[in-house]
């Protein structure tokens, strides 16, 4: 029995590090360097796709131009549905940027072999698997819908907090704090959980990589990008909506 236990102790076990970061020091601040690296990679991919699609613009689109125009049409339709015909156009770039960054970030975690690249500490991963990234995106969304409401209604925007009765003011304030929290933690939790589950299974059964689970992860990653962009547009639409007006189409 002791011989069996000693043999087991020498067998290599699968390991997966969580919470290990590659820090960059900026003065007295420490920055998660690996997240900046992967974020720059994602941004570069999006810019490259936009550049290639605009190299030789045709009246009848094909190839990359056709793909990017389809993506733009999808984003425009999503923004219009949530904000409304009257006010949606200025917000298409913002919602589109959110959707594309989150979508490409999520997929990069599943398709790009980040763990092959060794760092002095920590490991590369999808930007959206870091809580700092998702909180930043959620705070940008909060700033956007406050800006939308105040730019259209002035300080009268906050009068909506007292509707339908003044008793609702504390609840409306709490709601404003919970919106970015729910956005950030939903995205962070889903992407991190997906990476951990796939990572553990790949380590445990390296000869039979769980491809079906990876495909499911790609689908769920796309859904998370859609949910975030849809909710962001919906919050902006609520801020722009006139008090007492009927729901926009």
Swiss-Prot record:
GO terms for cellular component: plasma membrane-derived thylakoid membrane; proton-transporting ATP synthase complex. Keywords: ATP synthesis, CF(0), Hydrogen ion transport, Ion transport, Membrane, Thylakoid, Transmembrane, Transmembrane helix, Transport. GO terms for molecular function: proton-transporting ATP synthase activity, rotational mechanism. InterPro entries: ATP_syn_F0_a_bact/chloroplast, ATP_synth_F0_asu, ATP_synth_F0_asu_AS, F0_ATP_A_sf. Gene3D superfamilies: ATP synthase, F0 complex, subunit A. Key component of the proton channel; it plays a direct role in the translocation of protons across the membrane. F-type ATPases have 2 components, CF(1) - the catalytic core - and CF(0) - the membrane proton channel. CF(1) has five subunits: alpha(3), beta(3), gamma(1), delta(1), epsilon(1). CF(0) has four main subunits: a, b, b' and c. NCBIfam families: ATP_synt_6_or_A (TIGR01131). This is ATP synthase subunit a. It comes from Trichodesmium erythraeum (strain IMS101). The lineage of its organism: Bacteria, Bacillati, Cyanobacteriota, Cyanophyceae, Oscillatoriophycideae.
């Amino acid at each position: 029995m002791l011989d069996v236990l000693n043999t087991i102790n020498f067998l290599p076990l699968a390991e997966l590090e969580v919470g290990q970061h590659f820090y960059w020091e900026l003065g007295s601040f420490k920055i998660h360097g690996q997240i900046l690296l992967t974020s720059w990679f994602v941004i570069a991919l999006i810019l490259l796709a936009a550049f290639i699609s605009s190299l030789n613009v045709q009246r009848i689109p094909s190839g990359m131009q056709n793909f990017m125009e389809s993506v733009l049409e999808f984003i425009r339709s999503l923004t219009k549905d949530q904000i409304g015909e009257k006010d949606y156009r200025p917000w298409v770039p913002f919602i589109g940027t959110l959707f594309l960054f989150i979508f490409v970030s999520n997929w990069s975690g599943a398709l790009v072999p980040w763990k092959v690249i060794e760092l002095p500490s920590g490991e590369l991963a999808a930007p959206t698997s870091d809580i700092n990234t998702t909180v930043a995106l959620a705070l940008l969304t909060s700033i956007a819908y406050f800006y939308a409401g105040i730019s259209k209604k002035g300080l009268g925007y906050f009068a909506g907090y007292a509707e339908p009765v003044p008793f609702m003011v504390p609840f409306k304030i709490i709601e404003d704090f919970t919106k970015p929290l729910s956005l950030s933690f939903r995205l962070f939790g889903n992407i991190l959980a997906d990476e951990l589950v796939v990572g553990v299974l790949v380590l445990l059964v390296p000869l039979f990589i769980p491809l079906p689970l990876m495909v499911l992860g790609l689908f769920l990653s796309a859904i998370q990008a859609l949910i975030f962009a849809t909710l962001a547009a919906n919050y902006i639409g609520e801020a722009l909506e006139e008090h007492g007006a009927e729901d926009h189409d």
